[in-house]
């Protein structure tokens, strides 16, 4: 009998594949909408921290009503800096306000998908979105992928560019650095190729060092066989 594939083991959910969330700083969400829908709150940045679970640093902010929140830090944020969240917040880096109040051509990040969800889009280090146009019923924003997406005007966003840009410009150089990179998030690494495995471990395994069978697989194949090009319309280089 063959052994389970990596994706079968991952689906079972053993500690090998679980995210080490106990090491992470915590959830990064905006202050609930009912606090800031009518008035603007002032907060002070108390600390900027590294978060192993993210590609950007996070900042701990204490607001004037006593609530403490973690936010994704933008480029240029300082400890002790005052930031504002609400409909009347000034247009400045680090401030959060509804998209309807943000002028066209402004860089924003951590955009809500639905008003009050805390922020879902553009949260990775070095990323930003661009407010393209505003209409009464929607705001058009250009995402980092280049896609133009319409948002509810009441969705909140933070002004600025996410800190941590240029992270990928420095090469890893050696496998030892990659080891620690993946270890921080408990990623299963390195990932062996199927053709390098034994026949008992993978459908493409065995001594021949090539699959030995077509690499296209049915969408309805059973879990132990569903490897390779799944339900592919075509394979290989375009001619």
Swiss-Prot record:
- Which one GO biological process term can you cite for this protein? cytoplasmic translation
List each coiled-coil range: none
| Database matches in SMART domains | Ribosomal_L2, Ribosomal_L2_C
Q: Which GO terms describe its cellular component?
A: cytosolic large ribosomal subunit
Q: List keywords of the entry alphabetically.
A: Ribonucleoprotein, Ribosomal protein, RNA-binding, rRNA-binding
Task: Please list where the region (Disordered) is annotated.
Answer: 1-21, 203-239
Q: Which domain of life is it from?
A: Archaea
One annotated GO molecular function is: rRNA binding
Cited InterPro entries? NA-bd_OB-fold (IPR012340), Rib_uL2_dom2 (IPR014722), Ribosomal_uL2 (IPR002171), Ribosomal_uL2_arc_euk (IPR023672), Ribosomal_uL2_C (IPR022669), Ribosomal_uL2_dom3 (IPR014726), Ribosomal_uL2_RNA-bd_dom (IPR022666), Translation_prot_SH3-like_sf (IPR008991)
Stretches of Basic residues bias are at 222-239
The cross-references to Pfam families, in alphabetical order and at most eight, read: Ribosomal_L2, Ribosomal_L2_C
Q: Could you give the subunit structure recorded for this chain?
A: Part of the 50S ribosomal subunit. Forms a bridge to the 30S subunit in the 70S ribosome.
The text of the family note is:
Belongs to the universal ribosomal protein uL2 family.
Quote the function comment for this protein. Answer: One of the primary rRNA binding proteins. Required for association of the 30S and 50S subunits to form the 70S ribosome, for tRNA binding and peptide bond formation. It has been suggested to have peptidyltransferase activity; this is somewhat controversial. Makes several contacts with the 16S rRNA in the 70S ribosome.
Q: How is this protein named in the record? A: Large ribosomal subunit protein uL2
Q: Which organism is it from?
A: Pyrococcus furiosus (strain ATCC 43587 / DSM 3638 / JCM 8422 / Vc1)
